Amino acid sequence: MKKVLIIALAFLAFAGSNSFAQNEGMNMDQQMKIWMEYMTPGPMHEMMAKHVGTWKMVSRMWMDPNAEPQVSEGTVDAEMILGGRYLKMVAKFPAMGMQTEGWSLEAFDNGKKEFINIWIDNMGTGVAISTGKYDEATKSIIYHGKMYDPVAGKDTDYKSVSRMISDNEMIFEMFSNYDGKEIKMMEINYTR
């Protein structure tokens, strides 16, 4: 434990001295103000908090764009964590003949002014990571990301759109490229 504490303190000392060296023109109060703004949840975090609760989900997945979708139903439990800074969603639903559990962690980075989403589930060992911006006109968060496709043996690009329809209804859509065209791979409707 003592060794871990020493390593952590050494890291903080290095990171802090590096940060201070880059900002020699700022006094400590100015730097603290910037850090406080960075760490304080704001309007985008309040928007994420509207997802908190238990949701019923109906998922449609297209394995082939010319075929009928596979439909499944499940539940999602959503909560804000770490002082209202992050949205954690745990989804449970059947997919491809097995019970699936997936976790989504959504953040809004005050510094970069962008959303970040991380998805993991028991259907693989990889992590899907995407970043996005809020589109005021469509009231949607539009993400672009990468995930590993084990069949292709490489990362593939995807786009997803998350939109609150009302306080008790939201929709998530995921798109991929197929023969040079954007096609819908998944649509999930959430209600509570």
What are these regions (language model features)?
Residues 1-24:
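Bacterial Sec-dependent N-terminal signal peptides
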Residues 22-192:
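Hydrophobic small-molecule pocket/channel-lining residues, especially in calycin-type beta-barrels
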